[in-house]
Amino acid sequence: MYSDIPAGLALAFVIIGLWVLAWSADRFVGGAEAISRALGVPPFVIGMVVIGFGTSAPELAVSALSGIGGHSNLSLGNAYGSNIFNIAAILGVAALIHPIPVRPIVVFGAVPMLLAASVASCLLVCLGDGFSRMDGVWCLALFAVLLPLYCYLDGIGKCDADASSGEAASCRHPYLALFGGLALLIASSHFLVWGAVDLARALGVSELLIGLTIIAAGTSLPELASAIASARRGQHDFVLGNIIGSNFFNALAVVGTSGAISPFKDVSPHIFTRDLPIMVLLTLSIAVFGLNFRKPLSQGTIPRCCGGVWVCAFLAYLFLLIRQEALPA
């Protein structure tokens, strides 16, 4: 899937990719913000459907190609590792930049459905002998059922959507900024992943570790760049919509598409005992951290301290990964 490249060229890809990533993320979020205001669409819906699904395109491409190549652990590691990275690292960093307002419809609607999607994906992977094509079809069917419910629930909470609106958007060509920015986000993330995988291969690390760390983080760079740009603009619904939409897409559409193309076999037991439980717990933590315990039906806030907890949890998970995967089988 990835070809070996000289170390100097890999470093150039990383530097150029980082610069293009930062520039295109700002254009991408600016275009999405302008379009949502012009069409009167709630920012959370734009964040989930356009930004969340759009920035998950790298995960879909990498997992599908990994499945075709027979690399089941790389495919699942990419999808589930991206979900862990999205919450623990990206939401954590975004909350450290600015506390994130959380509407009740997110706590009681979007997050429980994301949790259901995550648990369903886990059960299909854990039960039976591997992950069959029919399991992939079930994932895609559940994705098709839950997607309209997400948008419907946000329509119920639309009345308080303006609570998290930031400064007015100014973008002369919003659609060009949106789709052009998305294309550059995806392209620049591939430059970064390409170089990172080449360096990891030289170090001789395991396929699962590459999928859970380098490729998962690399394909999540569009989400990270978009979340930071959204947080700086005060578009907090974009931040939450981005992460929830991306994780929903990864858990069902990415895993389902990859499994439907090529069934997963010889799945590492670490995915069952370590990665899936951590992904589910992190998903649940979004609702716990964002709930207003004094007034549950009022808007809550994810404070900076919770962002710090997420980042520390990700560092601990990363340490555990490196320690376990470095041990001989």
Locations of the language-model features?
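Hydrophobic alpha-helical segments, chiefly the membrane-spanning helices
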Residues: 1-329
